[in-house]
Amino acid sequence: VRRPILKSPAFLAALSVLVLGAVALQVSLARMQVVLRKLPIYAKDDLPLRTIASSVPGWERVGQDNILSKEVIEELGTENYLSRVYRGEFNGKPVIIELHLAYYTGMIDTVPHVPERCFVGGGMVQDGATQTVPIPLDLERLSIDPYVDQAEYGSVYSAVGENFQSVRMPFELDSRLKLRVTPFLDVRSDRRVFAGYFFLANGGIASSANDVRVLSFDPQTTYAYYTKVQFTSWDVESSEELGVIAGSLLDELLPQIMRRVPDWIEVMEGRYPPDNPNQPTPSNG
Protein backbone atom coordinates (compact mmCIF):
# COMPACT_ATOMS: atom_id res chain seq x y z
CA VAL A 1 0.00 0.00 0.00
CA ARG A 2 1.38 3.36 -1.00
CA ARG A 3 1.81 5.71 1.95
CA PRO A 4 0.27 9.25 1.38
CA ILE A 5 3.10 11.70 0.76
CA LEU A 6 1.78 14.17 3.37
CA LYS A 7 2.21 11.48 6.04
CA SER A 8 5.61 10.19 4.97
CA PRO A 9 8.44 10.61 7.50
CA ALA A 10 10.68 12.28 4.89
CA PHE A 11 8.06 14.91 4.06
CA LEU A 12 7.28 15.60 7.71
CA ALA A 13 10.98 15.93 8.49
CA ALA A 14 11.50 18.38 5.62
CA LEU A 15 8.44 20.38 6.69
CA SER A 16 9.74 20.57 10.25
CA VAL A 17 13.07 21.91 9.03
CA LEU A 18 11.32 24.61 6.98
CA VAL A 19 9.08 25.67 9.87
CA LEU A 20 11.94 25.78 12.35
CA GLY A 21 14.06 27.70 9.84
CA ALA A 22 11.31 30.28 9.33
CA VAL A 23 10.90 30.73 13.08
CA ALA A 24 14.66 31.04 13.57
CA LEU A 25 14.83 33.65 10.81
CA GLN A 26 12.08 35.74 12.42
CA VAL A 27 13.81 35.52 15.80
CA SER A 28 17.16 36.52 14.29
CA LEU A 29 15.63 39.47 12.43
CA ALA A 30 13.89 40.62 15.60
CA ARG A 31 17.11 40.43 17.62
CA MET A 32 18.93 42.46 14.96
CA GLN A 33 15.98 44.91 14.86
CA VAL A 34 15.56 44.32 11.13
CA VAL A 35 12.23 45.62 9.80
CA LEU A 36 11.14 44.14 6.47
CA ARG A 37 7.70 45.76 6.25
CA LYS A 38 7.79 49.56 6.12
CA LEU A 39 4.95 51.67 7.46
CA PRO A 40 3.70 54.82 5.75
CA ILE A 41 4.48 58.15 7.37
CA TYR A 42 3.48 61.72 6.63
CA ALA A 43 4.51 65.21 7.59
CA LYS A 44 3.24 66.76 10.79
CA ASP A 45 -0.29 68.11 10.21
CA ASP A 46 -0.33 66.20 6.88
CA LEU A 47 0.74 69.30 4.97
CA PRO A 48 0.66 68.44 1.22
CA LEU A 49 3.31 69.62 -1.22
CA ARG A 50 0.82 71.78 -3.13
CA THR A 51 0.67 74.18 -0.16
CA ILE A 52 4.23 75.40 -0.81
CA ALA A 53 4.29 79.16 -1.40
CA SER A 54 3.68 80.28 -4.98
CA SER A 55 5.73 83.45 -4.47
CA VAL A 56 8.98 83.84 -2.53
CA PRO A 57 11.72 86.49 -2.65
CA GLY A 58 13.20 86.49 -6.16
CA TRP A 59 10.73 83.95 -7.53
CA GLU A 60 7.06 83.98 -8.52
CA ARG A 61 4.70 81.44 -10.00
CA VAL A 62 3.86 81.60 -13.70
CA GLY A 63 0.26 80.65 -14.45
CA GLN A 64 -1.46 77.96 -12.43
CA ASP A 65 -0.10 74.70 -11.05
CA ASN A 66 -0.25 71.75 -13.41
CA ILE A 67 -3.10 69.52 -12.25
CA LEU A 68 -2.49 65.99 -13.49
CA SER A 69 -5.22 63.77 -14.87
CA LYS A 70 -6.41 60.70 -12.99
CA GLU A 71 -4.55 58.46 -15.44
CA VAL A 72 -1.28 60.38 -15.03
CA ILE A 73 -1.61 60.37 -11.24
CA GLU A 74 -2.08 56.60 -11.36
CA GLU A 75 1.08 56.32 -13.44
CA LEU A 76 2.93 58.70 -11.10
CA GLY A 77 1.96 56.55 -8.13
CA THR A 78 1.05 59.33 -5.69
CA GLU A 79 -1.52 62.08 -5.21
CA ASN A 80 0.85 64.17 -3.10
CA TYR A 81 2.72 66.11 -5.78
CA LEU A 82 3.43 69.61 -7.04
CA SER A 83 4.14 70.68 -10.63
CA ARG A 84 4.72 74.43 -10.81
CA VAL A 85 6.58 76.92 -13.00
CA TYR A 86 8.56 79.73 -11.34
CA ARG A 87 10.04 82.84 -12.91
CA GLY A 88 13.18 84.43 -11.51
CA GLU A 89 16.40 86.05 -12.66
CA PHE A 90 19.89 84.72 -13.36
CA ASN A 91 22.86 86.88 -14.37
CA GLY A 92 20.53 89.78 -15.08
CA LYS A 93 18.27 87.78 -17.40
CA PRO A 94 14.81 86.32 -16.74
CA VAL A 95 14.73 82.57 -16.29
CA ILE A 96 11.87 80.08 -16.17
CA ILE A 97 12.21 76.85 -14.21
CA GLU A 98 9.69 74.09 -13.55
CA LEU A 99 9.65 72.50 -10.11
CA HIS A 100 8.18 69.01 -9.76
CA LEU A 101 7.83 67.32 -6.36
CA ALA A 102 6.34 63.89 -5.62
CA TYR A 103 6.02 62.16 -2.23
CA TYR A 104 6.01 58.37 -1.68
CA THR A 105 5.75 56.39 1.54
CA GLY A 106 5.26 52.92 3.05
CA MET A 107 6.09 49.80 1.05
CA ILE A 108 7.53 51.76 -1.84
CA ASP A 109 7.34 49.43 -4.82
CA THR A 110 7.28 52.02 -7.60
CA VAL A 111 10.37 52.70 -9.69
CA PRO A 112 11.17 56.42 -9.31
CA HIS A 113 10.02 58.43 -12.31
CA VAL A 114 13.14 60.19 -13.57
CA PRO A 115 13.78 62.24 -16.74
CA GLU A 116 16.12 59.65 -18.27
CA ARG A 117 13.09 57.38 -18.68
CA CYS A 118 10.09 59.70 -18.77
CA PHE A 119 11.46 62.36 -21.15
CA VAL A 120 12.68 59.78 -23.65
CA GLY A 121 9.35 57.98 -23.36
CA GLY A 122 7.66 61.31 -24.11
CA GLY A 123 9.44 61.75 -27.43
CA MET A 124 12.63 63.60 -26.50
CA VAL A 125 16.15 62.36 -27.13
CA GLN A 126 19.06 62.57 -24.74
CA ASP A 127 21.44 65.25 -25.98
CA GLY A 128 24.54 64.77 -23.86
CA ALA A 129 25.95 62.96 -20.87
CA THR A 130 24.24 62.83 -17.49
CA GLN A 131 26.22 64.76 -14.87
CA THR A 132 25.97 65.16 -11.12
CA VAL A 133 26.59 68.81 -10.27
CA PRO A 134 26.68 70.78 -7.01
CA ILE A 135 23.68 72.73 -5.78
CA PRO A 136 25.20 75.75 -4.04
CA LEU A 137 23.13 76.94 -1.08
CA ASP A 138 23.57 79.99 1.11
CA LEU A 139 24.48 78.10 4.28
CA GLU A 140 24.77 81.37 6.21
CA ARG A 141 20.98 81.40 6.25
CA LEU A 142 21.06 78.14 8.24
CA SER A 143 22.42 77.17 11.64
CA ILE A 144 23.77 73.93 13.08
CA ASP A 145 20.97 72.33 15.08
CA PRO A 146 22.07 72.36 18.75
CA TYR A 147 19.56 69.65 19.71
CA VAL A 148 20.95 66.97 17.38
CA ASP A 149 23.83 64.61 18.17
CA GLN A 150 26.13 65.46 15.26
CA ALA A 151 28.34 62.46 16.05
CA GLU A 152 25.39 60.14 15.42
CA TYR A 153 23.62 61.89 12.55
CA GLY A 154 26.35 63.97 10.92
CA SER A 155 25.92 67.68 10.27
CA VAL A 156 22.28 68.68 10.63
CA TYR A 157 21.22 72.26 9.94
CA SER A 158 18.00 73.99 10.85
CA ALA A 159 16.29 76.91 9.15
CA VAL A 160 13.65 79.43 10.07
CA GLY A 161 10.58 78.36 8.14
CA GLU A 162 6.99 79.51 7.83
CA ASN A 163 5.53 81.33 10.85
CA PHE A 164 9.12 81.55 12.18
CA GLN A 165 9.12 77.85 13.06
CA SER A 166 12.43 75.99 13.18
CA VAL A 167 12.70 73.35 10.45
CA ARG A 168 15.40 70.66 10.27
CA MET A 169 17.28 70.23 7.02
CA PRO A 170 18.39 66.87 5.54
CA PHE A 171 21.41 65.09 7.01
CA GLU A 172 24.80 66.32 5.72
CA LEU A 173 23.21 68.98 3.55
CA ASP A 174 26.53 70.78 3.08
CA SER A 175 28.23 67.80 1.41
CA ARG A 176 25.51 65.61 -0.12
CA LEU A 177 23.21 68.03 -1.96
CA LYS A 178 23.82 67.44 -5.67
CA LEU A 179 21.69 67.49 -8.81
CA ARG A 180 21.70 64.68 -11.38
CA VAL A 181 21.24 66.55 -14.67
CA THR A 182 20.63 65.32 -18.22
CA PRO A 183 20.24 67.47 -21.37
CA PHE A 184 17.50 66.56 -23.83
CA LEU A 185 16.49 67.70 -27.30
CA ASP A 186 12.85 68.21 -28.18
CA VAL A 187 12.97 67.09 -31.80
CA ARG A 188 9.61 68.72 -32.54
CA SER A 189 10.76 72.23 -31.61
CA ASP A 190 14.52 71.63 -31.98
CA ARG A 191 15.01 73.13 -28.51
CA ARG A 192 17.32 71.92 -25.78
CA VAL A 193 16.11 71.41 -22.23
CA PHE A 194 17.97 70.47 -19.04
CA ALA A 195 16.32 68.34 -16.36
CA GLY A 196 17.84 67.46 -13.00
CA TYR A 197 16.72 65.90 -9.75
CA PHE A 198 17.62 64.57 -6.33
CA PHE A 199 15.68 62.73 -3.63
CA LEU A 200 14.93 63.38 0.01
CA ALA A 201 14.64 59.98 1.70
CA ASN A 202 14.35 59.03 5.37
CA GLY A 203 16.05 62.25 6.44
CA GLY A 204 18.90 61.98 3.94
CA ILE A 205 19.71 62.99 0.37
CA ALA A 206 20.20 60.76 -2.67
CA SER A 207 21.00 61.75 -6.24
CA SER A 208 20.06 58.51 -8.01
CA ALA A 209 17.15 56.06 -8.10
CA ASN A 210 19.38 53.28 -6.74
CA ASP A 211 20.61 55.39 -3.84
CA VAL A 212 17.09 56.42 -2.85
CA ARG A 213 15.98 52.82 -2.50
CA VAL A 214 18.96 52.10 -0.22
CA LEU A 215 18.04 55.05 2.01
CA SER A 216 14.31 54.32 2.01
CA PHE A 217 14.76 50.65 2.86
CA ASP A 218 17.16 50.97 5.76
CA PRO A 219 16.53 47.57 7.41
CA GLN A 220 16.51 49.10 10.90
CA THR A 221 13.80 51.71 10.32
CA THR A 222 10.08 51.12 10.79
CA TYR A 223 8.95 53.79 8.34
CA ALA A 224 9.95 54.77 4.82
CA TYR A 225 9.41 57.77 2.56
CA TYR A 226 11.06 59.61 -0.26
CA THR A 227 10.36 62.80 -2.19
CA LYS A 228 11.61 63.47 -5.69
CA VAL A 229 12.73 67.06 -6.24
CA GLN A 230 13.08 67.83 -9.95
CA PHE A 231 13.98 70.98 -11.89
CA THR A 232 13.51 71.52 -15.62
CA SER A 233 14.46 74.57 -17.69
CA TRP A 234 14.73 75.60 -21.34
CA ASP A 235 16.57 78.79 -20.37
CA VAL A 236 19.88 77.40 -19.10
CA GLU A 237 23.05 76.70 -21.06
CA SER A 238 24.59 73.91 -19.00
CA SER A 239 24.05 71.36 -16.26
CA GLU A 240 26.09 73.49 -13.86
CA GLU A 241 23.88 76.49 -14.56
CA LEU A 242 20.77 74.48 -13.73
CA GLY A 243 22.41 73.50 -10.43
CA VAL A 244 23.08 77.14 -9.54
CA ILE A 245 19.53 78.23 -10.39
CA ALA A 246 18.08 75.28 -8.45
CA GLY A 247 20.15 76.41 -5.47
CA SER A 248 18.75 79.93 -5.71
CA LEU A 249 15.18 78.61 -5.62
CA LEU A 250 15.97 76.08 -2.88
CA ASP A 251 17.39 78.85 -0.68
CA GLU A 252 13.77 79.98 -0.42
CA LEU A 253 11.83 76.73 -0.77
CA LEU A 254 13.86 73.98 0.92
CA PRO A 255 12.62 74.86 4.43
CA GLN A 256 9.05 74.68 3.11
CA ILE A 257 9.71 71.34 1.41
CA MET A 258 11.24 69.93 4.60
CA ARG A 259 8.20 71.08 6.56
CA ARG A 260 6.14 68.80 4.29
CA VAL A 261 8.15 65.64 4.94
CA PRO A 262 8.66 63.91 8.31
CA ASP A 263 11.30 65.28 10.68
CA TRP A 264 13.52 62.19 10.66
CA ILE A 265 15.31 63.03 13.89
CA GLU A 266 11.95 62.94 15.66
CA VAL A 267 11.16 59.63 13.96
CA MET A 268 14.50 58.02 14.86
CA GLU A 269 14.23 59.22 18.46
CA GLY A 270 10.74 57.71 18.69
CA ARG A 271 8.95 61.01 19.30
CA TYR A 272 7.03 61.04 15.99
CA PRO A 273 4.55 59.88 14.89
CA PRO A 274 2.52 59.49 18.10
CA ASP A 275 2.16 55.72 17.58
CA ASN A 276 5.86 55.19 16.83
CA PRO A 277 6.74 51.73 18.24
CA ASN A 278 10.22 53.02 19.12
CA GLN A 279 9.01 55.85 21.35
CA PRO A 280 11.10 56.32 24.48
CA THR A 281 9.95 54.61 27.66
CA PRO A 282 8.62 57.12 30.21
CA SER A 283 10.86 57.45 33.25
CA ASN A 284 9.49 56.47 36.65
CA GLY A 285 11.12 59.37 38.33
Positions of predicted regions on the chain:
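Short, Lys/Arg-rich N-terminal segment immediately upstream of the first membrane anchor
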Residues: 1-8
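N-terminal secretory-pathway/extracellular module detecting exported/lumenal segments
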Residues: 17, 34-37, 57, 63
